[in-house]
Amino acid sequence: MRVVRLLRLRAALTLLGEVPRRPASRGVPGSRRTQKGSGARWEKEKHEDGVKWRQLEHKGPYFAPPYEPLPDGVRFFYEGRPVRLSVAAEEVATFYGRMLDHEYTTKEVFRKNFFNDWRKEMAVEEREVIKSLDKCDFTEIHRYFVDKAAARKVLSREEKQKLKEEAEKLQQEFGYCILDGHQEKIGNFKIEPPGLFRGRGDHPKMGMLKRRITPEDVVINCSRDSKIPEPPAGHQWKEVRSDNTVTWLAAWTESVQNSIKYIMLNPCSKLKGETAWQKFETARRLRGFVDEIRSQYRADWKSREMKTRQRAVALYFIDKLALRAGNEKEDGEAADTVGCCSLRVEHVQLHPEADGCQHVVEFDFLGKDCIRYYNRVPVEKPVYKNLQLFMENKDPRDDLFDRLTTTSLNKHLQELMDGLTAKVFRTYNASITLQEQLRALTRAEDSIAAKILSYNRANRVVAILCNHQRATPSTFEKSMQNLQTKIQAKKEQVAEARAELRRARAEHKAQGDGKSRSVLEKKRRLLEKLQEQLAQLSVQATDKEENKQVALGTSKLNYLDPRISIAWCKRFRVPVEKIYSKTQRERFAWALAMAGEDFEF
């Protein structure tokens, strides 16, 4: 308890400004080096706590256009006979028909959910006829959309320009808002059209119908004195409110998971930049508390209270394995996903010895978005002993941490440090890991391509830590074959250039004149250029192979302080564009303005 009291005192002193900051040279907020753009717009015009804006005006969301029925020549067949579908049933049939060549339509769960929801959209007489998905033929529908996509690819330059102008006009009308007197870009002003839910991993709701959203589903958020957006003709908004403690412009509930969706500001906006900056600053602040927190949870492994022991072991997993805390779910929710606090006995196996290590814990469960988390990891002996204790006399479906809830864990984290959550731990460990990996992997003398490979390897370590997986892309084999073909062709060019260089060297040795020397230098430069190109292709192939099942983008955009990457780019003379795309550079404009080459997380 002494450590907890010290942590609370430290947190209070930090809020009062009494705890000394780290030296400016380490890139701490407040240092000139870090605050390179001290007049940046995300630092100006701050409101009191909780208030995000004074003025918010926008045009509302853009709705998906109404469904256009299929041409008469495109038919749906059942048991080999054409069936004329009602407009509602036909629209849902097109969602499936578009995906006919996709892996999803081979999955039983997807097919079952689709057929159940499709039948709900059918007229009574259609349901009496169409009783089995296996007897349905969507071939003509699929071919129609394939041909339509192919036609779009061969549009004339004038037709493409016209489509581009229409998109820009839409962007100008709906894609911007006025926030406190400044024009800000909106991130996603289009409401998602209806379709079939896919989900990630083996989601139990895949194939279900995502219904069309109408203005009657949408809540508008804007300032009281602004012009309220006009709903489409013949419609009205579900509600209009003025809540300046949130940053969304419109919200609605989607039909599959009953989750709330939002129209938000673009990530490069002032408010989003400020929010991201504060998120990473909170994670940086954990650095001053983390040693004491770790000492505390280690001490709690021996607590007399079972609740305290369970909390300490859970916190160890959140810290060391970057597990999510896990939120309590409503009874009957279909997806059996869990986090650290909701782990069951069946999700954990204990091995006294495995893979040459002692006290190994094997995790196997479905995490967020139904992504499988599988890991075998050695743990400290007290953790192993406690897990044995927690699992005693329990059935496989019983909770591992039966005295712990997400709410009680979060409350404890707040007591340790103001603003501390499991996600802050995740962000801290991800960012620290990237920084340490970059330091260990990068060599100043490496080529740009080799440095980028080192960066992606560091990013990969973080993605694996955070369990950011992806399925191997369907185009992977083909793209690798193309890459290997390029590598082979480049090797042949290098061999030919090397032979030409030998001949030029022999000629120069025999003649010794200026002309032969010029030819020799030209051949040498060509060989160097080709060798560099070959090295880049080889690095690209290695990078592609290593990351075929790892999603680097999720951690890069959400869990890694961009100032670490920008400082690394500046320190090792790597163009920032090699790490962040144009859109990502706009998103992290605040970090580009702040981070010097000596920034440390």
Curated annotation (Swiss-Prot):
Keywords: DNA-binding, Isomerase, Mitochondrion, Topoisomerase, Transit peptide. Its EC number is 5.6.2.1. The active site is at Y559. It catalyses: ATP-independent breakage of single-stranded DNA, followed by passage and rejoining. The keyword Transit peptide applies. SMART domains: TOPEUc (SM00435). Divalent metal ions (calcium or magnesium). Residues 268-601 form the Topo IB-type catalytic domain. Residues 1-50 form a transit peptide. One of its GO terms (molecular function) is DNA topoisomerase type I (single strand cut, ATP-independent) activity. It is found in: Mitochondrion. It is an enzyme of class 5 (isomerase). One of its GO terms (biological process) is DNA topological change. Signal peptide: none annotated. Its cofactor is Ca(2+); Mg(2+). CDD domains: Topo_IB_C (cd00659), Topoisomer_IB_N_htopoI_like (cd03488). Residues 261-262, 324-329, 421-423 are annotated as: Interaction with DNA. It holds the Pfam family Topoisom_I_N. GO terms for cellular component: chromosome; mitochondrial nucleoid; mitochondrion; nucleoplasm. The record marks R152, R200, W248, K279, T337, K368, N410, H468, K486 as: Interaction with DNA. Belongs to the type IB topoisomerase family. Releases the supercoiling and torsional tension of DNA introduced during duplication of mitochondrial DNA by transiently cleaving and rejoining one strand of the DNA duplex. Introduces a single-strand break via transesterification at a target site in duplex DNA. The scissile phosphodiester is attacked by the catalytic tyrosine of the enzyme, resulting in the formation of a DNA-(3'-phosphotyrosyl)-enzyme intermediate and the expulsion of a 5'-OH DNA strand. The free DNA strand then rotates around the intact phosphodiester bond on the opposing strand, thus removing DNA supercoils. This is DNA topoisomerase I, mitochondrial. It comes from Homo sapiens (Human). The gene is TOP1MT.
